[in-house]
Amino acid sequence: MNLNSIPAFQDNYIWVLNNDEGRCVIVDPGEAAPVLKAIDDHKWIPEAIFLTHHHHDHVGGVKELLQHFPQMTVYGPTETQDKGATHLVGDGDTVLVLGYNFSIFATPGHTLGHICYFSHPYLFCGDTLFSGGCGRLFEGTALQMYQSLMKINTLPDDTLICSAHEYTLANLKFALSILPHDSFINEYYRKVNELRVKKQMTLPVILKNERKINLFLRTEDIDLINEINKETILQQPEARFAWLRSKKDTF
């Protein structure tokens, strides 16, 4: 399969997977126009849409795309049933698309019904995990988001994290505000900054690398624990996650 990204809005990415025959699945099409152009440019044949959650910048283009391609199956969680989803899916389900099985698992936190789609090595994680960060808690709790990230963290090292937003540089700035002397984060920040200066995307990233630069996946890391302990003593990793998320919200 071939992985493609379509920029949308200010910082969204609409992901598209296509096979050698040109059949494709579209992930979180927040608007239709750039998707329709890409379909025309590449001569793709849309087969399905994956929706991760109900926010408009992820579902806004679904109904228009269905007008052009009514044969498409639109998979999504229950919270997307009025956003164009034709097949509701949830935790533990598997869907066969383009000849590949995609496992679906619940990742509440950003929204209560948020889900991810995984077919090795591709993980479409919407607004749950970003490179260097994680989604804001609009509906769920810090504990729910922590548990969702821990699910993702069990996936293979070479998993490709296909997040829905270009937030990497800002997330790394936050990480360096907490661990300013972390050599790996500093090195990666320089690389990411060079990419963004050239208007190049920083995604997808592999999970092995993400475990090193994403503080939200490092809540049991001794350097991070020592830094948090300067302000407050938190015994549980989920409490340290909540502390980080609160800090990021006001960064």
From Swiss-Prot:
<feature type="binding site">
    <location>
        <position position="58"/>
    </location>
    <ligand>
        <name>Zn(2+) 2</name>
    </ligand>
</feature>
<dbReference type="GO" id="GO:0046872">
    <property type="term" value="F:metal ion binding"/>
</dbReference>
<dbReference type="InterPro" id="IPR036866">
    <property type="entry name" value="RibonucZ/Hydroxyglut_hydro"/>
</dbReference>
<dbReference type="InterPro" id="IPR017782">
    <property type="entry name" value="Hydroxyacylglutathione_Hdrlase"/>
</dbReference>
<feature type="binding site">
    <location>
        <position position="53"/>
    </location>
    <ligand>
        <name>Zn(2+) 1</name>
    </ligand>
</feature>
<feature type="binding site">
    <location>
        <position position="57"/>
    </location>
    <ligand>
        <name>Zn(2+) 2</name>
    </ligand>
</feature>
<comment type="similarity">
    <text>Belongs to the metallo-beta-lactamase superfamily. Glyoxalase II family.</text>
</comment>
<dbReference type="Pfam" id="PF00753">
    <property type="entry name" value="Lactamase_B"/>
</dbReference>
<feature type="binding site">
    <location>
        <position position="127"/>
    </location>
    <ligand>
        <name>Zn(2+) 1</name>
    </ligand>
</feature>
<feature type="binding site">
    <location>
        <position position="55"/>
    </location>
    <ligand>
        <name>Zn(2+) 1</name>
    </ligand>
</feature>
<dbReference type="InterPro" id="IPR050110">
    <property type="entry name" value="Glyoxalase_II_hydrolase"/>
</dbReference>
<keyword id="KW-0479">Metal-binding</keyword>
<feature type="binding site">
    <location>
        <position position="110"/>
    </location>
    <ligand>
        <name>Zn(2+) 1</name>
    </ligand>
</feature>
<comment type="pathway">
    <text>Secondary metabolite metabolism; methylglyoxal degradation; (R)-lactate from methylglyoxal: step 2/2.</text>
</comment>
<dbReference type="Pfam" id="PF16123">
    <property type="entry name" value="HAGH_C"/>
</dbReference>
<dbReference type="InterPro" id="IPR035680">
    <property type="entry name" value="Clx_II_MBL"/>
</dbReference>
<protein>
    <recommendedName>
        <fullName>Hydroxyacylglutathione hydrolase</fullName>
        <ecNumber>3.1.2.6</ecNumber>
    </recommendedName>
</protein>
<dbReference type="InterPro" id="IPR001279">
    <property type="entry name" value="Metallo-B-lactamas"/>
</dbReference>
<keyword id="KW-0862">Zinc</keyword>
<comment type="function">
    <text>Thiolesterase that catalyzes the hydrolysis of S-D-lactoyl-glutathione to form glutathione and D-lactic acid.</text>
</comment>
<feature type="binding site">
    <location>
        <position position="165"/>
    </location>
    <ligand>
        <name>Zn(2+) 2</name>
    </ligand>
</feature>
<dbReference type="GO" id="GO:0004416">
    <property type="term" value="F:hydroxyacylglutathione hydrolase activity"/>
</dbReference>
<dbReference type="InterPro" id="IPR032282">
    <property type="entry name" value="HAGH_C"/>
</dbReference>
<dbReference type="GO" id="GO:0019243">
    <property type="term" value="P:methylglyoxal catabolic process to D-lactate via S-lactoyl-glutathione"/>
</dbReference>
<feature type="binding site">
    <location>
        <position position="127"/>
    </location>
    <ligand>
        <name>Zn(2+) 2</name>
    </ligand>
</feature>
<keyword id="KW-0378">Hydrolase</keyword>
<comment type="subunit">
    <text>Monomer.</text>
</comment>
